[in-house]
Amino acid sequence: MTFVIADRYELGASIGSGGMSEVFAATDLLIGREVAVKMLRTDLAKDVNFRERFRREAQNAGKLSHPSIVAVFDTGEVDRDGISVPYIVMERVHGRDLRDIVREDGPYSPSQAATIMIPVCHALQSSHEAGIIHRDVKPANIMINNTGGVKVMDFGIARALDDSTSAMTQTAAVIGTAQYLSPEQARGKPADARSDVYAAGCVLYELVTGRPPFEGESPFAVAYQHVQEEPTPPSEYISDLSPTAALNVDAVVLTAMAKHPADRYQTAAEMAADLELLSRNAVSRAARAHVEKPDEPETVVVPQRLSTPPPPPTPAMPAATVAAPAAAPTAVGSRPAAARQPKRGSRALTVLAIVLTLGVIGVGGAFTYDFLSNSSSASTQQIPNIVGLPENEAVLELERLGFTVVLTTEPSPDVAEGLVIRTSPNVGSEIREGATVTLTISSGREVVTIPDVTGLTLAEATREIEGAGLVLDQSIREENSDDYPAGTVIQQNPRAGGETSVGASITLTVSTGPSLVRVPVITGMQWSQAESNITSLGLVPDIYYVDSLLPEGQVISASGQGTELPRGSTVTVEISNGMLIEAPDLARLDVDNALKALRDAGWTAPDTSLIEGAPIPTGALVDQGRIGFQDPSPGQPLRKDAVVNIRLYRFDLTALVPEP
């Protein structure tokens, strides 16, 4: 049985499911577009708070527009078994996610992995600039389509997951996310754009090694490692890397995965810039910075809430700095050789000693996130709320606090020219004193000319509108139109040719075709009267005059009488031409009287059209010269101008002699 949502989206087979939702292949019946519909699980939809957050975040995700972000076209709610279930209508992507690709095909080379992660970081940067933190960046949320394009999914949905007070925390969605959870999220602190950078680093780690950076028997065990432990450098799992190539991939991955947000790439765009270098096997900025600064011994921070102090940590060996020729480029599509086992060294022994100490004093795995939140951190400064301030005031305030300020500009439909749109990192983020804060300043509205889409199909109009940087309002009106075919645009608001802001919404009115009219019954009427009955309704008569016994001009038949047809439809009408008469009975009339009888019946042919055939012998002298046969027979239809065939009797004596 076909299931249609909102009288528009026809659901097909289920194409995926997760901890909190199920995804169906679907068709947008209005414009014939292939889409995917994600529906929240019914047990989670019972939580009103979660449902509201899901709806709000879906709307936020729908505001994003980037080629590497799976587009959200529509949202709504549908009744399922008496429960109002939210759904999201998304772009349908044909391909595989990175989780399945790595599981089935093995890890990527560092340059290949970097090539994949570049558009991921660009997508994240676009999202962050729109004020949306993904919060659930992981391989399962990154698709590679059938043409090799990269698509990031589920923008904004994870915020609903983090903010929920429902039993959602027990679902597989959280368990799967723990492997890519930033330390600040594990501590229960707010996430910002750098939390997504950390998760992107975890994904990059898995792409080049074939395994996540941390694994454990429970989500808590994994989260604890994100907070307290350093990951094994990814180069330890990659064969055939030169020292320089190993340093390069390690620097990019571990910079993204720095424990403190201030030590990471501060924006996804910064990470993308280093990935560009890594994809070309060029030395990344992170690797260059590592080589240029003096090595510092690693230390392990022991939680402060233990009742008995653990043994002092054993310092790990400082990372070596080497200079060697750059690694030869790896062919696109190739995969590295089998990974070798990591060399753990004294750092691994130190971590093991701490874990054993925790086990001895009975703490085991029963820590809480509150415990993790007490880990020590470096001195930080909070970014003040300067959004909406003039540029000079904002710069002075940040410099007063000791931050380095970088300025960028972009158009904004909502923020006046010269005012701060946002900061990166976000307002309220805690970063190290002296760190760089990027201010995005409004350059005012960016305007575009509204294209004329009247007369186009809805699919064509959608492409024109989106190509102009505008958004199609999903509330599409429908009206009858005698001038525009069904499915084409009748009106648009705002009108074509005007100017509006990029991202503005365009509302369309689409034709459902002409209005319906009821065809009147006109059979038996004179056409001179019936014609106005047809044409006054906007119907078009198609007239055929036919031979008929009915009076000339009388309607014999009309198509569609009593039914409803679209205005402008053709009605076929048959009208009598009055050319038929009933043939009179000419039996035993002479030719003159026969002609008179024909004329009286309405026959208009010349006298010569009364054709005499072979005579009929008769022994009755009285029938001599009279008609004994006629064609057509009496009472049969006869065209007024048609030939009439007759045969006359002729007296013949032989007819009196009986045959022997």
Swiss-Prot record:
Record GO terms (molecular function): ATP binding; protein serine kinase activity; protein serine/threonine kinase activity
Active-site residues annotated for this sequence: D136
Coiled coil: none
InterPro entries: Kinase-like_dom_sf, PASTA_dom, Prot_kinase_dom, Protein_kinase_ATP_BS, Ser/Thr_kinase_AS
Keywords, alphabetical: ATP-binding, Kinase, Nucleotide-binding, Repeat, Serine/threonine-protein kinase, Transferase
SUPFAM superfamilies registered for this protein in UniProt: Protein kinase-like (PK-like)
EC number: 2.7.11.1
PROSITE patterns reported in the protein's UniProt record: PASTA (PS51178), PROTEIN_KINASE_ATP (PS00107), PROTEIN_KINASE_DOM (PS50011), PROTEIN_KINASE_ST (PS00108)
Catalysed reactions listed for this entry: L-seryl-[protein] + ATP = O-phospho-L-seryl-[protein] + ADP + H(+); L-threonyl-[protein] + ATP = O-phospho-L-threonyl-[protein] + ADP + H(+)
Domain Protein kinase: 9-278
Family indicated by similarity: Belongs to the protein kinase superfamily. Ser/Thr protein kinase family.
Protein name: Probable serine/threonine-protein kinase CE0033
Organism, scientific name: Corynebacterium efficiens (strain DSM 44549 / YS-314 / AJ 12310 / JCM 11189 / NBRC 100395)
